[in-house]
């Protein structure tokens, strides 16, 4: 029994699942003539799902109303029996009275059987259809049961439809699947012809001849069936109070044992049309969205239920056949078919499937041919929008001779509120882009567009209107079509403009200019349009150019455009207006080749805010024409240049990491006719930057160049003349800086070309300049000794003899590496050879190796074998004053015969003449400007030194370095390597000697004797005899 509820409950689940999911961006909207501003709304009871189905209804007097189904309306017993409402048409809307039907459960005893109907949750109004003055409202979940003694048929949703004539008050009911067969019989017959789960009326339509056709997707145990009966016979055979009766003229489709139909929901949607060429018969279009294991299909049957065509879905579970519609969209007089698949999934660029929905258009060919492949696919654009859930023929909405359609996406549009898209018919079928997009005026979850009806003129203005149901909001919106004004626009202008013919004068400056006339003509036609019509005409000159770069202007205003208000008379015959324009001076613009485009656009005058215009403008509202400038290019007025370009480069190769500057030297020539807007185009590689460009043309030494992007590549464009005249030759030198070459490869390429805007042979051949890229690094190794020299006594004093507490002075050998660039180096290896291994016979005791700057060093053999704490005070000589070994003033004197005579010449102590300590250092990477240093701390080993009292030494260390690679993909010019040596001079001082006393006495006496002789000589020459200057008293006495 639960299975019987599947079809519509599944539908409801499909429609409600995505109310909480967000939609994608809406497609652009092109407004046509459905007024989206001045809407009419009808509302039903809250929670009734008012708007689940709807249709137009005309009574016998031609009055139009809207019949609306609300399948969850509460009945008299406050149970959800459903309901149907009839809304009289008023522009301002209004109340919708409900149609009265018998909504009570019924029980009748017929012989030994008890017949029962159950109308709670029957879904009255799940489908409604109007024909003539009759309204058909169906309740597909009305349940039925037959009891006989201890047996029953089981309570199942056979479905039923109620018919009403509102004017006469007549009522009837039609339930083609009711029967009195018990469940046991169905089981014995393997459920053949089992109609207990029909859900008759799930879909419904009435033919022009008045035959009611019902889809019952649960019939024959969910294979589906179709029931047909004339409306008149239903009324005539109906007897109130009788629950089981027979319409003699009805017909039902056949049961099938084909597995493809199992659970296919055949009858889920239904439509009628003409598809066999016989105008006296009507064919049935039946949708089965889960046919053949959810592939879906639509079948076209004749009046005897014989299949004429079968259209298969293209994607599993797309629900192909959820909706069907029949209309003639290409104006050939034959019905065409549209099929909706709202769950169709599209494969997108990210290889993910997106559920967007799709509508298939099948154009009926001439002759008795199958429909074949779809002529057009309309695919939704919004994720989970359910595009194609409903399709409605609109009639000829814009009165162009072709019928149009509306397609709903109930969960598309802004915030998933719903959207209806209008597609216009044309001779090829339908236009692939919507002419108008109607966004829901209701909040999210309204399912705006779940039901649609069109093709009826509700306001009697000669244009068909559209009604849209939004059962989630319990409302219906009426969109009225506005009259369409079809404009005809003509623009006349001369073919060419000769700059040399200056027949006009600018009013302000009296400057002669070349001028020409522009004639504009505008007319309008349309059905039921106003007698007086006002249009705005906007004229734009040279519209493809920026406003400041327009080449032609209006003579009077010197502007590039104008707007005119045109009043069309009662017959709307074309009116014309002429204005004059002029060509600007050639020095004021560059482009002399491209056509000068003039455009005329016609529009309706603006309306007040919130008000829609009374008519819609359509047709040729925009027209453009073009003229051109006469050039000095021979009789054909077509210039054909012959552009030549040669180029070379200086400053190569390029070095990675360096600030490279290249000079591109180019020679440009034109051996043909003038090249207009000629320019040199230089495509710069990655890392290159334009600096400046110079030419050898007098007066134009510095070229005007600009940069722009073309296909993600920076291009330098330098002007070469407008035009670049015949036989012109220009030498160009362009400076370009190039950096960031780490990923450039072994070369970079400059692409050079001369371009022009000429139509024939506009460009030169492309010249490629390949500049090699190389890597290089200059690494410098320097060494230093601290101090550079030492002075040590030649002999050992008593206090220091055999003493291990007093070490010799410190000696430091420092090696510094500096990468001067421009590149980075990898795998730097430094090897330092030091004389001595800290043994008693060595002159140096090596205390420690101190690397800096990332170096990792490993000495061999290990240093400081005695574990001397070199943090304790050890004599450290000043680099300015060489250190001496400390001695007391009292000297030790050797016996006279043993005194040394003189010091020996310095002896070189290196790894070539002494045991050696080797220090190996490695640095993984050394960037440009980086420094690294190794300091070797040592002190003199005095016991070994004093064993050779007269020897002087030069202590020499030696260092080498090399680099294994440079971290670039380009070959290096060379791998850095080098060496350095450090020397420390070790000098000896002899013992001081005592001075004899007689040497002192002789020196004193000699000094006194020399002083006496000096005084006597000075006295002899009168040095001590002086004349005093006279005093004042002496002068007075003299007077």
From Swiss-Prot:
Disulfide bonding pattern of the chain: 87-96, 138-161, 177-198, 504-515, 521-576, 633-639, 705-718, 857-921, 911-916
Glycan attachment residues as annotated in the record: 46, 280, 601, 711, 874, 878, 962
InterPro entries documented for this protein: FG-GAP, Int_alpha_beta-p, Integrin_alpha, Integrin_alpha_C_CS, Integrin_alpha_Ig-like_1, Integrin_alpha_Ig-like_2, Integrin_alpha_Ig-like_3, Integrin_alpha_N
GO biological process: angiogenesis; cell adhesion mediated by integrin; cell-cell adhesion; cell-matrix adhesion; integrin-mediated signaling pathway; positive regulation of leukocyte migration
Signal peptide: 1-31
Residues bound to Ca(2+) 1: 274, 276, 278, 281, 283
Effect in UniProt of substituting residue 320 to S: In GT1; type I; impairs surface expression of alpha-IIb/beta-3
Sites bearing Pyrrolidone carboxylic acid, chain numbering: 891
Residues spanning the membrane: 994-1019
Binding site for Ca(2+) 4: 457, 459, 461, 463, 465
This protein's name: Integrin alpha-IIb
Organism annotation: Homo sapiens
Upper lineage: Eukaryota, Metazoa, Chordata, Craniata, Vertebrata
Primary gene name: ITGA2B
